[in-house]
């Protein structure tokens, strides 16, 4: 009997696992296509087997990492497992940080010591922006307090031996495979597939190798960042600190400055390839461990006409924006890749500046119709482009593309596979036939690999620029972007920007709300998704939310309240008499609510569902209250914080000028989710203050203050269906589960379609016409 019970339990577990796998997002499902575009070296990791671990799990490096004599003057520790630790209080911190951002992934950046990690992808990004293997190892040795472990040197050589050495360049509308290493070109040409891709002349002979010398000069003018009107990020080495710096390290810093400013002559060897075989060529180069790095020589592109667009004189780049663009245009060509900047730090201006630099047709893709409108406004604000040259393509706005230079659309519009309207088909045909110089991909972290491939096959662009604030995904598929778009070109430090006044100084707080006894009793008893509704609709959480809204409205603050659950969103907003936006809200109503929020002093609070997580530009907002969220998503937490990160006018930089409250019901699953969600922001240097009691809450007149009101709310929650407990599914959102089945409790009447059917009996007087031909027998029994 025990064996049978065990088998039954195993069956139930396997069914549960199967159900949970079916609940995964579409982009979580592994696909063959995402693997074929990743070189095998990219999956390699640093060997950590030699690291000793004590009984408490701490790593002991004392025997492996002997200190140098002048270690106090050097800012880095390089551990054998690939982790690098940087002293943020070092006088040469700025130079060391710039170098580490180029070669490693930031892991954690609190106030005093920052942690980075060497990965295959970060080293791929390093060589793609011009760093050589010898440069990386030499710089690490000079900056490190200890000797660099041999395993780290071998790992760097393994990952950089082939990455970034071969480029696919578009010049004069012809494609060339180019490299500054002639031996690599000869190695590639020995492969029969690549020889087949090589262009041949009329006699059938392969075209000759082309050797040329070009000067790498930045396409971004240095004057763009002068007079930036804000605090300088420069933290150069002061005169007092130079005496403590070893001579070899000081010479290295001076050389780094010269390398950034000097023009460099590079000799390259290239051969021309057939345009129709580009995709086959790229796949073959990846198999040979020489992935092609795409570069666009836009200055020599004569086939695609220049568009009439320039930056306005009022558009002034901040130092970090200029630095990110220098990574993109560092050698006079446009590199494809991803730029990571915090929300509110001016990603849109970076995109507009890139479009003004390339000066070719530009396609911008966002993730909602609101973001399309905001991108159009950003182009008109920062550039000289005429309104008639901007074309929008959304479900609501389909501008005529005649004479269009900048097209703005959404991922869902381009990736749409079902039947379109006649007008939409015409616009799609026009998008497909255009040769785009630049494609700007906003909120690029949200795009699953398969969806993005679909977009790539529809439109062709010479250069792709991805913009995001959070290069993280819970499914670890963010690495796919390295080969679908390009390497990470630049990532800013959130705390540095905050301390310099470029983004708001935010006080993050987690407010613990005790569950009322009645709600907690039901929470423990119920095992369905309705548990989510119970801890979201907790009366004490509602009262805390109402108190915070009243408190900040008295200070004339602008408040956004976020809720992933639509049932809770409506209940809170209607009870508090506040406007709310969610999926079905029309585009016109959304814009009206947002405009009122920005300019109407009487509208200081709005409620928004998950549709507002990204691409909602609300610079006036300085308070955010979160009442429900998407599980333990780190990305969503950072995106929501970004709604209040924009620098506030007239605020003192030393004081907190924005507030982020996350309301959590105590002793529920929500507390575990909250801890997971905060990981990304804590790694960026933010700290969360835990508030167990809001001072002054007892004096306020708040809703649900009596047991009767709380009992009525509980009955309303219990009467809701499991479908009400689910999160909102946003139309057009990638990975949505709208096409999948969902489990919920039901009754036999529901299954028969009788949910809204009422059985009623009533008497009606018979008309004379109906009783005219009645048999006498039945007349006798009539009442």
Swiss-Prot record:
Assigned keywords, A-Z: ATP-binding, DNA damage, DNA repair, DNA-binding, Helicase, Hydrolase, Isomerase, Nucleotide-binding, Nucleus, Phosphoprotein, Transcription, Transcription regulation
SMART domains membership: DEXDc (SM00487), HELICc (SM00490)
Gene3D superfamilies the UniProt entry points to: P-loop containing nucleotide triphosphate hydrolases
Single GO MF descriptor: DNA binding
PTM: Phosphorylation on Ser-752 by CK2 controls the 5'-excision activity of ERCC1-XPF endonuclease; phosphorylated protein inhibits the excision activity and thus NER. Dephosphorylation reactivates the 5'-excision step. Phosphorylation has no effect on transcription or the 3'-5' helicase activity.
Source organism superkingdom: Eukaryota
Single GO cellular component term: transcription factor TFIID complex
Subunit record text: Component of the 7-subunit TFIIH core complex composed of XPB/ERCC3, XPD/ERCC2, GTF2H1, GTF2H2, GTF2H3, GTF2H4 and GTF2H5, which is active in NER. The core complex associates with the 3-subunit CDK-activating kinase (CAK) module composed of CCNH/cyclin H, CDK7 and MNAT1 to form the 10-subunit holoenzyme (holo-TFIIH) active in transcription. Interacts with PUF60. Interacts with ATF7IP. Interacts with KAT2A; leading to KAT2A recruitment to promoters and acetylation of histones.
Family affiliation: Belongs to the helicase family. RAD25/XPB subfamily.
NCBIfam families according to UniProt: rad25 (TIGR00603)
Descriptive protein name: General transcription and DNA repair factor IIH helicase/translocase subunit XPB
């Amino acid at each position: 009997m025990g064996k049978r019970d065990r088998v039954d339990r195993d069956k139930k577990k396997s069914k549960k696992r199967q159900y949970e796998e079916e609940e995964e997002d579409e982009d979580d499902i592994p696909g063959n296509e995402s693997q074929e575009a990743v070189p095998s070296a990219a999956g390699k990791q640093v060997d950590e087997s030699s690291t000793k671990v004590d009984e408490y799990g701490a790593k002991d490096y004392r025997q492996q990492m002997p200190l140098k004599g002048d270690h106090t003057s050097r800012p880095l520790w390089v551990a054998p497992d690939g982790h690098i630790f940087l002293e943020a209080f070092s006088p040469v911190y700025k130079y060391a940080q710039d170098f580490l951002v180029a070669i490693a992934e930031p892991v954690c950046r609190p106030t005093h010591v920052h942690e980075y990690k060497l990965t295959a992808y970060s080293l791929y990004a390093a060589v793609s922006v011009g760093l050589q293997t010898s440069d990386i190892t030499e710089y690490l040795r000079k900056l490190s307090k200890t000797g660099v472990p041999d395993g780290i040197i071998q790992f760097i050589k393994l990952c950089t031996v082939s990455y970034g050495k071969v480029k696919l360049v578009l010049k004069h509308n012809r494609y060339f495979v180019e490299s500054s290493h002639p031996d690599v070109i000869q190695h590639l040409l020995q492969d029969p597939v690549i020889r087949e891709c090589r262009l041949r002349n009329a006699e059938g002979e392969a075209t000759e190798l082309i050797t040329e010398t070009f000067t790498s000069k930045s396409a971004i003018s240095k004057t763009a960042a002068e007079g930036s009107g804000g605090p300088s990020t420069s933290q150069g080495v002061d005169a007092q600190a130079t005496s403590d710096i070893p001579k070899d390290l000081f010479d290295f810093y001076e050389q780094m400055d010269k390398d950034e400013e000097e023009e460099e002559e590079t000799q390259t060897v290239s051969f021309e390839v057939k345009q129709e075989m580009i995709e086959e060529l790229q796949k073959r180069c990846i198999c040979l461990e020489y992935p092609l790095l795409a570069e666009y020589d836009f200055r020599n592109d004569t086939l695609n006409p220049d568009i009439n667009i320039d930056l306005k004189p009022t558009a002034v780049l901040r130092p970090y924006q200029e630095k990110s663009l220098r990574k993109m245009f560092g050698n006079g060509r446009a590199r494809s890749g991803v730029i990571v900047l915090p929300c509110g730090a001016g990603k849109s201006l970076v995109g507009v500046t890139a479009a003004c630099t390339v000066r070719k047709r530009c396609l911008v893709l966002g993730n909602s119709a609101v973001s399309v409108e905001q991108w159009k406004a950003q182009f008109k604000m920062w550039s000289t482009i005429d309104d008639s040259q901007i074309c929008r393509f959304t479900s609501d706005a389909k501008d005529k593309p005649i004479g269009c230079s900048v097209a703005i659309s959404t991922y869902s519009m381009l990736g749409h596979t079902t039947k379109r309207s006649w007008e939409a088909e015409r616009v799609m045909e026009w998008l497909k036939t255009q040769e785009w110089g630049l494609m700007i991909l906003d909120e690029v972290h949200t795009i699953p690999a398969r969806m993005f491939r679909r977009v790539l096959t529809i439109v062709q662009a010479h250069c792709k620029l991805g913009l995001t604030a959070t290069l993280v995904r819970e499914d670890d598929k963010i690495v796919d972007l390295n080969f679908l778009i390009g390497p990470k070109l630049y990532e800013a430090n959130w705390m540095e920007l905050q301390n310099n006044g470029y983004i708001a100084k935010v006080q993050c707080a987690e407010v613990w709300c005790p569950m009322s006894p009645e709600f907690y009793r039901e929470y423990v008893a119920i095992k369905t998704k309705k548990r989510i509704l119970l801890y979201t609709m907790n009366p004490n959480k509602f009262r805390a939310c109402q108190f915070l809204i009243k408190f900040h409205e008295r200070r004339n603050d602008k408040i956004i309240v976020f809720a992933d659950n639509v049932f809770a969103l409506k209940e809170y907003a209607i009870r508090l008499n506040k406007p709310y936006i969610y999926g079905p809200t029309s585009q016109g109503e959304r814009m009206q609510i947002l405009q009122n929020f920005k300019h109407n002093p009487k509208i200081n609070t709005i409620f928004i569902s998950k549709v507002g997580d990204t691409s909602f530009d609300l610079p006036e907002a300085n308070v955010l209250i979160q009442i429900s969220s998407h599980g333990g998503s780190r990305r969503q937490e950072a995106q929501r914080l970004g709604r209040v990160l924009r620098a506030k006018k007239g605020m003192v930089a030393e004081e907190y000028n924005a507030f982020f409250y996350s309301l959590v019901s105590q002793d529920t699953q929500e507390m575990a989710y909250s801890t997971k969600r905060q990981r990304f922001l804590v790694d960026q240097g933010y700290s969360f203050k835990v508030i167990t009691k809001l001072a002054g809450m007892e004096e306020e007149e708040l809703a649900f203050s009596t047991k009767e009101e709380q009992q009525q709310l509980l009955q309303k929650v219990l009467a809701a269906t499991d479908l009400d407990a689910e999160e909102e599914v946003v139309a057009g959102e990638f990975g949505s589960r709208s096409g999948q089945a969902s489990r919920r409790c039901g009754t036999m009447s529901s299954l028969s379609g009788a949910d809204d059917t009422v059985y009623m009996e009533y008497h009606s007087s018979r008309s004379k016409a109906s009783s005219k031909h009645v048999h006498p027998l039945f007349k006798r029994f009539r009442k």
